[in-house]
Amino acid sequence: MKLTHLLLAGLIGLTGCSPKVTQKEARMIELQNPILPGYFADPSLVQYDGKFYMYVTADPWGTDFLSCWVSDDFQNWTFHTLNWPTKAACTTPLSETNKVWAPSVVQKGDTFYMYVSDGSEVWCGKAKHPLGPWENALGNQPMIPGDTTRYYHVIDAEAFVDDDGKSYLYWGSGWNWTNGHCFAAELNDDMSSFRTKPVEVTPTRYFEAPLMVKHNGKYYLTYSEGKTIDETYEVRYAVGDNPFGPFAEAGNSPILKVNDSLRVYGPGHHTLFSYGGEDYMLYHRHR
């Protein structure tokens, strides 16, 4: 069976009720989806200087490089290959032949920081522009090495910058599509080392791809559950009063799942962004 990853965007609501989409908004979404047909997954989005920068895994299971798509209207996109990360630049004895995948990019001040998976390791890069040139923030070493633990998968790192300027990193998954674990720690100002010791913050029915957002003083930990290769994959969320929780799953979770009337599956590993006064979810799915 051919697997095609489709990157899509849709309106999203995290306020305890289902999102309401007007006819005008629905038409806009329909015209834009899918955004990138092909083998692209695990999107991360940055808005900078009037343009959208979408970072993606260039193949469903990782490649020797990562790519970035750029647009100023969210409809017409140009492809760019990044100088970092590459498998050659992100290799340790523990990463072996695993590829690079699942990029996550955040801006803090005048610097962009990227967190990327390679095997069961997390690497951190930095740049002054979304397209680079990028460099490894820690020389030739991973930020979270593969020997951290053998009980969970060290992948899918995502940074969150709070209103007070403090920054946090969330990451973690499970083995064999089960028993996902999510960890969090406050970051130092360099965004590539920890100020606090990592703690487990795993919410209900968590597997991978954590993403933190803040709304009206509450912390929303969004994440994927299930197998990315089948209809069990979906996006859920839980709410807490601080970046470390505890997090209680909301009543309208999941907020993204398979539509039984469509021949698609595996919607998830998302990112959230705001534009034009609306909040959107960007995600991949299989067809």
Give the ranges of each region predicted by the language model:
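Carbohydrate-active catalytic/glycan-binding domains of CAZyme proteins
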Residues: 17-287
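Bacterial Sec-dependent N-terminal signal peptides
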Residues: 1-26
